[in-house]
Amino acid sequence: AYARLVGVPVAELDDVVFARYPLAVRINNDYYARSIQRVNDDLSLSFYCAVENGIVLTAMHTVSILDELDQTLSDIEQRLGPAWVTLGCDCCLRRQEIEADGTVDQASALLRRHSVVGFNTYGEQFNGMHINQTMTGVAIGRRQRSRR
């Protein structure tokens, strides 16, 4: 069913396809990615995080990962002032997507421009839930004090 949904033959389902066509679970008004790990021999799917039997998953569409990241970091800098440093924890599945898109150099330049340092993770915990395909971080700004 997933292969038909995304228009890709089962034999061609791989990490790149899984990253480009994620599934998500809806909780209240928010969607949380449920990243596919592999296609099993019986054609069922295994996920990187818990997916209970009977849970409804929604097909999601991705946007430009770099455009979205640049906008988010710019918004944070608008609120905090220029970032001194941001410690970023980026899901390894995002890294795979960037590599597949051939945009590693552009991603590195964007992260340097916004003073981001960090590492790749295997997802994050949020409110007790394991989520994937996300970037979390701590931004430390350097807002100037006003003189009195």
What are the roles of these predicted feature ranges?
Residues 1-114, 121-148:
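Small-residue-enriched flexible segments
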